[in-house]
Amino acid sequence: LHEKINSRVHDYYWNEDFSCVVTTLKVLSELFYPRLHPQVIDAAVGLNAGRFRSQCGLVQGTLLFIGSYGCQQNIKQEQIITLCRQFGIEFQEHFGSLLCNQLRPQGFRPDNPPHLCEKLTKQAIAFSAKFILEKINPMTKLQMGN
């Protein structure tokens, strides 16, 4: 699992130049095989959390994925909302914040190298995948793809 996450994050950042939100959505969709409508990816491009320095795109991407995946698995909206809230709480407890400007290793400076959050992205997507496996998949009785 970690090997695939690490490989895909690196590829999406350095070969595709995707944002953290889009990278999160794409990697999670590859792990769990839902069909994400192209408009979901298009909408995620507009979030671009890192440039606004508010809620981390790694959180936003996972919340978008939970909503989309949950609906595809016929999980009730109320349960999806509860799962998203629970994810936010657990992410904040684990990583210390939900805010991009607090999670980003070196803050925001013009001389920052590209994809400064690659290590954090790999950790956050692994955390998100574990959350989905433990909290959402048991509700759907599905197993994660290889």
Locate predicted features:
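A short glycine/serine-rich beta->alpha loop
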Residues: 7-15, 45-54, 74, 108-113
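Phosphate-handling active-site elements
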Residues: 31-42, 68-83
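DPxDG-like acidic metal-binding loop motif
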Residues: 61-69
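Active-site-proximal helix-loop elements at catalytic-domain edges
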Residues: 5-31
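C-terminal binding/interaction regions
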Residues: 80, 85-146
